[in-house]
Structures are given as C-alpha cells and as structure tokens.
Amino acid sequence: MIDHTTTFVLTSTILAAMTTLFLLWVRRLEAGSRRLGYAVVAASGVMCVTYLLMAAGVLTVSTTGRDESVARFLGYSIAWGAVASVIGLISGAERRYTLALLGGILLSLWATVGSWILGGTAGTVISLAIVAGVGVMGATLYGPLARQAQTVSSERTLLFSRLRNLTVLVFVGLLATGMLSAQNLAFTDAFVGQTLATYLDIVWLAGFGGLVLRSTDALADATDDRPATAAVNSSSSTDGATTGSVQSAD
C-alpha cells in the first residue's frame, strides 16, 4: 500500500505539470482574457503547494481517527475562491452573489474540519452547518447566478452551466468523502479516503482549467463586459447622488 507522503508528493508533481501547462495555455490567450485564465493557474498552483505542505506534515491537527493537515483546507479556501470568482464573472452577476457562493463553500469546508475535530453532539451540530453551506451554494448557483447567466451571451451561459455542474459534482463528492471517512462514519479507511479526495482534486482542477481555457469566446465577452458593467454602476451611483442633492436643495 502506498503511504500518504508518497501519494501527496506524486499528486503535487501532477498538479505542478498541470499548472505549467495551464500557464503556457494562458499566455496564448488574448491579453484581455488572461485575467480569468490566471485564476485557473492560481487554483492549480495553490493546490500543488498544498499537497507539498501535506507531505511535509505541516499544520496537522488531531482528529477522530488520525491526524489531518489543515493545509488542505487552506488550499481549498483559496482555490475555490478562484473558482467562485470565475463563475461570478462569467455569469455577470453582482459581487454579493459571488461572495454568497464562496461563503457557502467555505462554511461547508470548515464545518467538515470541525466535525472531524469535535466528536459527539458538537460534531453532529457542526455537521448541520455542512448541510447549510451546501444549501447556500446550491441556492446561489441555481438561483441568482443562473438567472443572470441567462442574460449574457450563449457562450458564457454554456460555460457557466458546465462550471456549475462540475462544481456541484466535485464538491458533493468531496463532502461525501469527508463524511464517509474514518473521522466521521468510518465507512472508509484513511488510505481510501485520501485516494478518493486526491482523485477528485485532480478531476476538479483539470476540468476547471480545461473548461475555462477552451472557452475563448466566453472569456473575451466577459472581459469586454466588465468595463461596461462598471460604467453602468458608476452612472447609477452618480445619478443617485445627483437626485439626492436635488431633493436636499428642494
């Protein structure tokens, strides 16, 4: 059986190769589209470093069943932040909905850590926060973000739908792996749990990168839309301030 350290180093090597490939791919994009492309590079690069930290045993905490590295969840927080940012920009939704999406994701992730550390009733209560986080994530993805995505170009709508489906499938898979792990329901041992989580991470990052970087038309349209959106928001703020001044004068 392969030990965890070897698995983590091997995974980090795979992610390093993916990050390099994504970086070269991004450099071939139009200048305006590279910002979204660099989010892909950041997500993959952060998880590459995360797996190296896990291999070194950095930031480990004692959980029910075995020691776990909090570094994985710090990496997840940054990488999923990059994913949420891209989804929000592609959909054209307001920033508050992107933050709501990220908030739901982070709540579920860190509640999972809490459920591992705290056993008994406290662990059960924290598990409810996992469900709440998934609920917020799903409601945001299938609610305001989906509605706004219907108002943008067909290329962006298609990319949003694919990213949404990938996010839901991978995220639910990661949470299911965490719940079935030795720290919770103990349906899987440590080796199986780590292997499943590692596989899902590679699928998630490869899928995210491939979907985003191949959708050049969607990236270009989203980039062109940003200045227009900013101008509209600025105009609305100016109009509101002018109206307020006139009313005060009256």
Task: Enumerate the language-model features and the residues they cover.
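Hydrophobic transmembrane alpha-helical segments in integral membrane proteins
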Residues: 1-18
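Haloarchaeal acidic low-complexity proteome signature biased toward cell-envelope/secretome components but also
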Residues: 1-5, 32-35, 142-162, 216-250
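Hydrophobic alpha-helical transmembrane segments of multi-pass membrane proteins
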Residues: 14-17, 36-57, 168-182
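Alpha-helical transmembrane segments in multipass membrane proteins, preferentially the mid-helix core
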Residues: 18-24, 133-157, 173-181
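Membrane-interface helix-boundary motifs at transmembrane edges
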Residues: 25-39, 89-97, 149-159
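Helix-loop junctions on the outward
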Residues: 31-33, 49-72
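Membrane-proximal helix-loop-helix units in multi-pass membrane proteins
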Residues: 80-82, 86-152
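Extracellular/periplasmic helix-loop-helix junctions in multi-pass membrane proteins
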Residues: 176-201
